[in-house]
Amino acid sequence: GVVLTTGCDKSTPAAIMAAITADLPSIVINGGPMLDGHAVDPKTGEERLVGSGTIIWQARRMLAEGIIDKDKFLELAMSSAPSVGHCNTMGTASTMNCIAEALGLTLTGSAIIPAPYKEAQMAYQTGRRIVEMVREDLKISKVLTKESFFNAIRTNTAIGGSTNAQVHITAMAKHAGIEITASEWEENSHHLPLLANVQPSGKYLCEAFYRAGGVPAVMSELLKHNELYGQVMTVSGKTLEENLKGREISNSKVIAKFEEPLKKDAGFIVLSGNLFDFAIMKTSVISDDFRKRFLERKGSEGIIEARAIVFEGSEDYHRRIEDPALNIDENCILVMRGAGPVGWPGSAEVVNMQPPAYLIKQGIESLPTLGDGRQSGTSDSPPILHESPESAVGGNLAYLKTGDIIRIDLNKRSCDVLVDEETWNRRKKEISYEDKIRESQSPWQELFRKTVTQLSEGAVMKEAIKFKRITQNLPRHNH
């Protein structure tokens, strides 16, 4: 058996995918998030909670406005890391550790214990339990079912989890031989409410979330309303429903009741159109200002029509975002391409682009953004991202030009470029997307690019998902 010790972002799904491939008795324990950070807000002069990552995006905007200088920027950034541990926001680190618990791969309540807390003694209980699991032959394949993955998707909505969860949950399911379709993502996500009042979707941080009841309290609320599969097996040897008995919310300011959520219909929206077959948008981070400015225009509610400003990677964005020749205004959408699994390679967290400084000074803190890469789980903006197929494999994003009009209709779940077919076909003949792909910098990158799938499919390596239960057969002797 194996104890999987996890922490930030990709460490959790990577460890779980390896365990699935080996199919040994496996249990997850993570190092825990940092304690809550505190700092004086430069805008109000009052003390406020400061969350890992999220404060970076907020401080960047304050820097652009001229409210703070670079020294203050660094001070704010450092104040968000007051102790050992991973990010204390509901970024990808905390999200994926919560997902591990939702999948039934941790002992109940272990996902979000702050790193310095004495309750980290849960590691001892985890060690005892793995020995029992070996004796019981409780392998990971007996825990992970399609229903447990649906539980993970639903829990991700309720906690306001990272958009990266779409990639990682899909990848873990692929390794387990389970297909999760685009329609199943929305069916198990969008209709559910946001319950966890944790940054970036909310106000508080993970220390307060843990003290309010953490993941078990959130899942208990979902289970009470028949939104989870309670009979799935977990590493405790008990069903999920048995594990959640008696788990209640202890602070309704931090974890809302199902009937009184922070937001309704808070899950990911799945989009498609003539630019891509698949993309997602995280609705729980749509701010009131963004909603009023872009989604509540009279007669066009839920519809955005905007002029595309196209960037070829983050370097191009940073070089040109302040260029007055681009004439960027609030009727624009910022587009990032070349950021997918093949194009980057590996897919970069660069789609959450902020507007030019002169717009931020006018009070426009975010513009619609779109791209074939990812964003940080700590980001407080709602881009349309994970576009598949990406531009580097000939996806239609490769043929988009600055000045094209993009129409996004959230009601119809569509995203289209308004360019006539004749013009579009001519571009496909004239533009070579291969010329924009940067050379691989290592043999590993070359191998990765040849075998990786798209973000819609979890960005898994095609050859890797062929292998199942590899510990059942010993390798040949080579001496």
Q: Whereabouts are the PLM-identified features?
A:
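A short, small-residue-rich loop immediately preceding and capping a beta-strand
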Residues: 1-15, 27-30
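Catalytic or ion-coupling anion/metal-binding cores of large enzyme and transporter domains
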Residues: 12, 18-23, 31-390, 395-479
